[in-house]
Swiss-Prot record:
PANTHER family per record: KH DOMAIN CONTAINING RNA BINDING PROTEIN
Function: RNA-binding factor that recruits target transcripts to cytoplasmic protein-RNA complexes (mRNPs). This transcript 'caging' into mRNPs allows mRNA transport and transient storage. It also modulates the rate and location at which target transcripts encounter the translational apparatus and shields them from endonuclease attacks or microRNA-mediated degradation. Preferentially binds to N6-methyladenosine (m6A)-containing mRNAs and increases their stability. Binds to the 5'-UTR of the insulin-like growth factor 2 (IGF2) mRNAs. Binding is isoform-specific.
GO MF annotation terms: mRNA 3'-UTR binding; mRNA 5'-UTR binding; N6-methyladenosine-containing RNA reader activity
Modified residues (Phosphoserine): S11, S162, S164
Region span, Disordered: 156-188
Entry text on domains: Domain KH3 and KH4 are the major RNA-binding modules, although KH1 and KH2 may also contribute. The contribution to RNA-binding of individual KH domains may be target-specific. KH1 and KH2, and possibly KH3 and KH4, promote the formation of higher ordered protein-RNA complexes, which may be essential for IGF2BP1 cytoplasmic retention. KH domains are required for RNA-dependent homo- and heterooligomerization and for localization to stress granules.
Name under which the protein is recorded: Insulin-like growth factor 2 mRNA-binding protein 2
GO cellular component: cytoplasm; cytoplasmic stress granule; cytoskeleton; nucleus; P-body
InterPro entries with a match to the protein in the record: IGF2BP2_RRM1 (IPR034843), KH_dom (IPR004087), KH_dom_type_1 (IPR004088), KH_dom_type_1_sf (IPR036612), Nucleotide-bd_a/b_plait_sf (IPR012677), RBD_domain_sf (IPR035979), RRM_dom (IPR000504)
GO biological-process terms attached to the record: CRD-mediated mRNA stabilization; mRNA transport; regulation of translation
Keyword match Metal-binding: no
Species the sequence originates in: Pongo abelii
């Protein structure tokens, strides 16, 4: 798709040659036609990265024939819909903070990071409605954040101009900036940006950032990457997660530079051992990294001269819902191993993303939102789910917050309805939180609640936060969830590490539904919820294909 730019506030004396020369002098050559009108002009750039560079370089900064020109995307009023672009985002702004800011103005359907060569970040944001996007433009234009002033533009929403059916394909999840268009790419040829997640010892974080942020700025500049150090996650932990967004080559180079900094710091502080590389990877990808009988890992170890181990499933938690791949060896060896490991993980992830197009959309709730890019919705309005989550009674105040501030903020962030049911008695030990929303909203809301309970010390620091969740399923599908001789539910428990209880003698409610109880830590509970929903969906599809009698036989 061409990126048409509007050039405004031009003097009547300006010619096409003037514009071509001005753009050329600033290394922004115009290859296509320049459409010059009285006082304004239009130019096209096939590459969004070049378009952004032109806006940032020229708009409000360059004088031509005595007038300061304005440059922005050319979007007619009828195309000013749900899509906006935010530029000049601070390079070290945590994505979680940006998520919360964007969610204040409406439901965010998709956030894509645009790969640019600017020091600051650029994202394209799609709101659920035109009105929400309009409010966001008004409120965020010029918004000051860490001495950076946001710059906002409308960008064309292809769905407004194309007579497509109501079903919206390729609509991503909130906070999904990691899967932006590659420079020069189109929406059909989208490059999936698969970020590298690593754990670094907390004592090295200062060295990686450097004085006044100079070291990390140097890393991002040299490697054309974005490096997020999640300093606030899991306060007091010995290690902090670091997320690197870039091309595969840029990611690997940034990783190598971080390894070198840590090793240098370790040498100077006389730490005897080599600092291992710890890569975080989603559990669903790890099996394919290991390979049959461990062949893939053994091959990487042999070729790079490293020793590689992978954490057990039992280590999964809300703060680290990924497996930890520990690579031991020299800096050079670890860097070489990272290239090969990420190659395998990236390949597996891309295959999964292709699979999403033909399967139910539960992937989006299994892959953590801070790690990967947008996951397609398969309907304009994703199916609403209701989950009842039980929390300690003494934690209710922390979840609600002062005058309800925290629960309102949480609901906005997640895009869910969150209500706390009245206590069933004066001395109950648990209260029920009713969460209503699509899968992505469930993931975010439940994740934040688990995290809040951990942060506020309602559980022992060494104790895993385990909560009970109730979901309702049609009574006709309960047998399928249990499986013959309990086989399915046993496999489900082994896969997810959650306890799943489907009472056989439960009386269905007025909607012919029964309650499935799920007990476990956040990641275990989420995986179990998604797998159970998938089973229910499969039964529904069977019932649509076959007469009722046949379908009911199939479900038993």
């Amino acid at each position: 798709m061409m990126n048409k730019l509007y050039i405004g506030n031009l003097s009547p004396a300006v010619t096409v040659d003037d514009l071509r020369q001005l753009f050329g002098d600033r290394k922004l050559p115009l290859a296509g036609q320049v459409l010059l009108k009285s006082g304004y002009a239009f130019v096209d750039y096939p590459d969004q990265n070049w378009a952004i560079r032109a806006i940032e370089t020229l708009s409000g900064k360059v004088e031509l024939h005595g007038k300061i020109m304005e440059v922005d995307y050319s979007v007619s009023k009828k195309l000013r819909s749900r899509k906006i672009q935010i530029r000049n985002i601070p390079p070290h702004l945590q994505w979680e903070v940006l998520d919360g800011l964007l969610a204040q103005y409406g439901t965010v359907e998709n956030v894509e990071q645009v790969n640019t060569d600017t020091e600051t970040a650029v994202v394209n944001v799609t709101y659920a409605t035109r009105e929400e996007a309009k409010i966001a433009v008004e409120k965020l234009s010029g918004h000051q954040f860490e001495n950076y002033s946001f710059k906002i533009s409308y960008i064309p929403d292809e769905e407004v101009s194309s007579p497509s059916p109501p079903q919206r394909a390729q609509r991503g999840d909130h906070s999904s900036r990691e899967q932006g268009h590659a420079p020069g790419g189109t929406s059909q040829a989208r490059q999936i940006d698969f970020p590298l997640r690593i754990l670094v010892p907390t004592q090295f974080v200062g060295a990686i950032i450097g004085k006044e942020g100079l070291t990390i700025k140097n890393i991002t500049k040299q490697t054309q990457s974005r490096v997020d150090i999640h300093r606030k996650e899991n306060s007091g932990a010995a290690e902090k997660p670091v997320t690197i967004h870039a091309t595969p080559e840029g990611t690997s180079e940034a990783c190598r530079m971080i390894l070198e900094i840590m090793q240098k710091e370790a040498d100077e502080t006389k730490l005897a051992e080599e600092i291992p590389l710890k890569i975080l990877a989603h559990n669903g990808l790890v099996g394919r990294l290991i390979g049959k009988e461990g062949r893939n890992l053994k091959k990487i170890e042999h070729e790079t001269g490293t020793k590689i181990t992978i954490s057990s499933l039992q280590d999964l938690s809300i703060y680290n819902p990924e497996r930890t791949i520990t690579v031991k060896g020299t800096v050079e060896a670890c860097a070489s191993a990272e290239i090969e490991i990420m190659k395998k993980l990236r390949e597996a992830f891309e295959n999964d993303m292709l699979a999403v197009n033909t399967h139910s959309g539960y992937f989006s709730s299994l892959y953590p939102h801070h790690q990967f890019g947008p996951f397609p919705h398969h309907h304009s309005y994703p199916e609403q789910e209701i989950v009842n989550l039980f929390i300690p009674t003494q934690a209710v105040g922390a979840i609600i917050g002062k005058k309800g501030a925290h629960i309102k903020q949480l609901a906005r962030f997640a895009g869910a309805s969150i209500k706390i049911a009245p206590a069933e008695g004066p001395d109950v030990s648990e209260r029920m939180v009713i969460i209503t929303g699509p899968p992505e909203a469930q993931f975010k809301a439940q994740g934040r609640i688990f995290g809040k309970l951990k942060e506020e010390n309602f559980f022992n620091p060494k104790e895993e936060v385990k909560l009970e969740a109730h979901i309702r399923v049609p009574s006709s599908t309960a047998g399928r969830v249990i499986g013959k001789g309990g086989k399915t539910v046993n496999e489900l428990q082994n896969l997810t590490s959650a306890e799943v209880i489907v009472p056989r003698d439960q009386t269905p409610d007025e909607n012919e539904e029964v309650i499935v109880r799920i007990i476990g830590h956040f990641f275990a509970s989420q995986t179990a919820q998604r797998k159970i929903r998938e089973i229910v969906q499969q039964v529904k599809q069977q019932e649509q294909k076959y007469p009722q009698g046949v379908a009911s036989q199939c479900s038993k």
